[in-house]
């Protein structure tokens, strides 16, 4: 005992120092802790832990028991404090914790590789997610490797002069590198700026300039598009390439990060620090840069776990693209619980069911068309459920578009044991969850639900006054996830943010039980298969056709996609044109922007010259579009 006593003292002091350093913000994040609970909690916990370690240093078995017991209690209390919002911290700290607590556990799995772009053309044919039909492909990383990759990229950025407040763009398809790159950016204090993988070269340049991006990280699918603008965009920024066969105008991400330290950079982060910029477009079609801080990101993680109850044993299947706030913020539930997530590159029913079966997925986030395709494939015999192990699948939830009640009724007949939830949100509200249905309210399918965890909602008239229950007004939300502003657009910010309330542009009404239903859209946006289409972009393109005098693009209800773009076209006199000719002309557009329906008719305009789209919707829809979808 005498010989081991000095070792015990050293062990005690070392544990105490390490506990305070690593679990209380490493001594550099105290400014982000709004209350002293975090410091006190870890100090006391590790003091007791180290006391037992010291007292039992002569007995390895007792040491093992006490150390691991208090580690477990520390972890459980830590999670409880996060869920109750007792203290705040940057989202990067959760990754650090996972690397310490669950280092050898699988964090991310990528199933099926992406389609490689040859040059400039094939990207126009992209669906929402594209699989490679040639071969099955799978790779994975653990939490410790995830954190190590994030640290290496962070240290690379710092070595290139990136500092707090700089911006780093991400132009990647879903892949195993995406999230470590995102977190590497956050660890430097820089802002992550995800870009839509469907952007044209002109849109990429516009967004890089608008957000004042300093570095762009891009993948092989974007070589053609980036090459077109490389001379312009590389003058004031660095280009990093992720993948094989690095083009000459960029630097190779893998080679650069391989030589960087894997240790965590000590950069002070607070809740109020800017964290990310996401892009959204208004009715003009020009992207707006949406600025969020670290508090927004952390709140998104709390919301997701509170709504869906993720535990360490859950496995989340993520299919939509990670540049969306929706996909990433739903994944934050896996992050905060330390559980596994699977990135699937394919939307065919057999792909989804096979992945759920192989990876033992318990939570699946779908869009309406994918859920419909699964049910149709089951009904037609295209897939046989008995081939798959699906008993662990507990929750299916849908967001990004109105959900027909008939779809969920069909789903529950096939999967009666599944919980179901609807999530409503905007990029301006850090994605899904500011309003949600709730897993126990399936009788209210068709509604978007009630205020989410930590959120407030109200419905107002044109003067900003709260309307009576049952009356239609504009939906407004307020909470820690509301954007800071539209970056470099104070006018749009002032129109959207008022006294902390985010005016969504969606018209809604509340029923007698307090559940909110969307009625129509104030904003002129079409949501097709979960993706936003901006009519003005399609209209501007169609107006370049020699035979077209005037055009208006509206959304029409579609059972599978929710909405489809319909072009009402007024032809010039003596310029005959057929639907087939218009469709052929539209092949120049990316596939997702092409109108699904062509209608030849006069375009009504009001006295000020504005197209009367409400009148067109009434003519061709018969009722407000969202209400019609809700009745599906």
Walk through the language-model features, giving the residues of each.
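Conserved AMP-binding/adenylation subdomain of ANL enzymes
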Residues: 298-315, 323-363, 377-378, 383
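AMP-binding/adenylate-forming catalytic core of the ANL superfamily
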Residues: 199, 216-218, 356, 364, ...
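Conserved AMP-binding A3 loop
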Residues: 140-144, 275-299
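Conserved pre-ATP/AMP-binding loop-to-beta segment of ANL
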Residues: 103-106, 258-279, 286, 309-315
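Gly/Ser/Thr-rich phosphate-binding loop
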Residues: 336, 361-366, 375-443, 456
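ANL superfamily adenylate-forming
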Residues: 74, 111-139, 221-271, 378-382, ...
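Conserved AMP-binding/adenylate-forming core of the ANL superfamily
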Residues: 83-87, 96, 104-175, 179-183, ...
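Structural core segment of the AMP-binding/adenylate-forming
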Residues: 60-61, 70-71, 93-95, 159-160, ...
């Amino acid at each position: 005992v005498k010989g081991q006593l000095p070792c015990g003292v050293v062990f005690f002091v070392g544990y105490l120092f390490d506990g305070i350093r690593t679990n209380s913000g490493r001594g550099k994040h105290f400014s982000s802790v709004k209350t002293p609970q975090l410091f006190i909690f870890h100090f006391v916990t590790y003091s007791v832990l180290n006391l037992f370690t010291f007292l039992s240093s002569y007995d390895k078995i007792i040491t093992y028991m006490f150390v691991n017991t208090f580690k477990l209690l520390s972890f459980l209390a830590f999670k409880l404090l996060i869920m109750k919002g007792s203290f705040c911290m940057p989202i990067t700290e959760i990754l650090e914790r996972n690397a310490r607590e669950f280092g050898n556990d699988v964090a991310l799995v990528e199933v099926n590789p992406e389609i490689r772009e040859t040059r400039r053309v094939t990207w126009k044919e992209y669906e929402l997610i594209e699989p490679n039909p040639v071969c099955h492909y799978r790779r994975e990383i653990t939490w410790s490797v995830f954190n190590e990759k994030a640290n290496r990229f962070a240290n690379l950025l710092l070595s290139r002069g990136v500092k707090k407040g700089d911006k780093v763009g991400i132009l990647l398809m879903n892949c195993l590198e995406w999230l470590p790159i995102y977190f590497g950016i956050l660890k430097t204090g820089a802002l992550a700026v995800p870009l839509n993988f469907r952007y044209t070269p002109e849109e990429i340049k516009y967004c890089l300039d608008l957000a004042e991006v300093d570095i762009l990280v891009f993948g092989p699918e974007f070589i053609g598009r980036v090459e077109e603008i490389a001379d312009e965009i590389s003058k004031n920024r660095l280009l990093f390439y992720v993948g094989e066969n690095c083009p000459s105008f960029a630097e190779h991400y893998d080679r650069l990060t391989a030589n960087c330290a894997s240790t965590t950079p000590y950069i002070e982060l607070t809740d109020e620090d800017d964290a990310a910029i996401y892009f959204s477009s208004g009715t003009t079609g020009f992207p707006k840069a949406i600025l969020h801080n670290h508090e927004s990101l952390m709140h998104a993680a709390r919301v997701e776990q509170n709504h869906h109850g993720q535990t360490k044993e859950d496995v989340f299947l993520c299919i939509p693209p990670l540049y969306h706030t929706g996909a990433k913020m739903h994944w934050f539930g896996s992050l905060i619980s330390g559980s596994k997530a699977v990135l699937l590159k394919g939307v065919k029913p057999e792909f989804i069911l096979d992945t759920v079966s192989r990876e033992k997925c318990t939570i699946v986030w779908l869009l309406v068309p994918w859920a419909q395709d699964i049910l149709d494939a089951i009904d037609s015999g295209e897939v046989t459920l008995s081939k798959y192990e699906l008993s662990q699948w507990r929750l299916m939830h849908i967001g990004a578009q109105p959900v027909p009640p008939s779809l969920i009724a069909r789903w529950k007949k096939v999967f009666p044991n599944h919980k179901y939830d609807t999530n409503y949100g905007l990029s301006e509200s850090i994605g899904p969850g500011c309003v949600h249905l709730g897993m126990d309210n399936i009788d209210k399918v068709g509604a978007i639900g009630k205020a989410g965890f930590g959120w407030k909602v109200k419905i107002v008239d044109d003067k900003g006054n709260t309307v009576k229950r049952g009356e239609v007004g504009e939906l407004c939300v307020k909470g820690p996830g509301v954007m800071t502003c539209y970056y470099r657009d104070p006018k749009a910010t002032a129109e959207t943010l008022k006294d902390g309330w985010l005016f969504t542009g969606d018209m809604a009404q509340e029923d007698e039980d307090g559940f909110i239903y969307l009625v129509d859209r104030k904003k002129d946006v079409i949501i097709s298969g979960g993706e936003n289409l901006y009519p003005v972009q399609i209209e501007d393109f169609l107006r370049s056709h020699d035979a077209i005098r005037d055009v208006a693009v509206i959304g029409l209800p579609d059972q599978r996609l929710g909405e489809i773009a319909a072009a009402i076209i007024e032809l010039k006199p003596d310029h005959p044109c057929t639907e087939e000719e218009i469709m052929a002309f539209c092949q120049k557009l990316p596939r997702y922007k092409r109108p699904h329906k062509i209608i030849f008719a006069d375009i009504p305009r009001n006295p000020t010259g504005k197209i009367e789209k409400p009148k067109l919707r009434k003519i061709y829809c018969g009722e407000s579009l969202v209400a019609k979808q809700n009745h599906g």
